[in-house]
């Protein structure tokens, strides 16, 4: 296997909080997939959840080589955890099509946060 895409991003959690305070759940609906939304409505720390999803999706879109645009939107990049808690990425719609075009066979994800920032790294291999 060889690396075909690397994306890294970080965001100040206060930035996400301010966006959320301005737009509320409209912001959450814009960036979350249907499955992520189902988890979001059940959690207490919504700002941290949104910050990690936002930063991970930015990193994933960079790894795809597209960035977030009119075709590849936030809600087409779905993050979840496997049974052991490892973060995983699922491509949907146009993002899935793009991942097939670049022959993505393996995805590596790391997401972290601390008091002020959230970070993510996504590596795609063929």
UniProtKB/Swiss-Prot annotation:
Q: Principal place where this protein is found?
A: cytoplasm
Task: Give, as one word, the top-level EC class.
Answer: transferase
Matching entries from InterPro entries are given as: 4-PPantetheinyl_Trfase_dom, 4-PPantetheinyl_Trfase_dom_sf, ACPS, Ppantetheine-prot_Trfase_dom
Could you state one GO cellular component term attached to this entry?
cytoplasm
Q: Which cofactor does it need?
A: Mg(2+)
**Which Gene Ontology BP terms does the record give?**
fatty acid biosynthetic process
Q: Where does Mg(2+) bind?
A: 9, 58
GO MF, one annotated term: magnesium ion binding
Which pairs of positions does the record mark as disulfide bonds? none
Q: Where in the cell is it found?
A: Cytoplasm
Q: Which Gene3D superfamilies match?
A: 4'-phosphopantetheinyl transferase domain
The record lists the membrane-crossing segments as none
Kindly state which reaction or reactions the protein catalyses: apo-[ACP] + CoA = holo-[ACP] + adenosine 3',5'-bisphosphate + H(+)
EC number(s) recorded for this UniProt protein: 2.7.8.7
* Coiled coil segments of this chain: none
| Keyword Magnesium listed | yes
Q: Keywords of this protein's UniProt record, alphabetized?
A: Cytoplasm, Fatty acid biosynthesis, Fatty acid metabolism, Lipid biosynthesis, Lipid metabolism, Magnesium, Metal-binding, Transferase
Family per record: Belongs to the P-Pant transferase superfamily. AcpS family.
Task: Fetch the NCBIfam families from UniProt.
Answer: acpS, pantethn_trn
> In UniProt terms, what function does this protein have?
Transfers the 4'-phosphopantetheine moiety from coenzyme A to a Ser of acyl-carrier-protein.
Protein name in UniProt: Holo-[acyl-carrier-protein] synthase
Species the sequence originates in? Buchnera aphidicola subsp. Acyrthosiphon pisum (strain APS) (Acyrthosiphon pisum symbiotic bacterium)
Q: Identify the coding gene.
A: acpS
């Amino acid at each position: 296997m060889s690396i075909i895409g690397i994306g890294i991003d970080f965001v100040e959690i206060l930035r996400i909080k301010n966006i959320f305070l301005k737009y509320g759940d409209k912001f959450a609906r814009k960036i979350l997939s249907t499955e992520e939304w189902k988890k979001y409505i059940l959690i207490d720390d919504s700002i941290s959840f949104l910050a990690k999803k936002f930063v991970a999706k930015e990193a994933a879109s960079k790894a795809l080589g597209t960035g977030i645009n009119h075709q590849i939107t936030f809600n087409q990049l779905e993050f979840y955890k496997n049974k052991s808690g490892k973060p995983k990425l699922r491509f949907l719609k146009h993002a899935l099509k793009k991942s097939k075009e670049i022959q993505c066979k393996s995805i590596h994800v790391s997401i972290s946060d601390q008091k002020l920032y959230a970070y993510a790294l996504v590596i795609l291999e063929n």
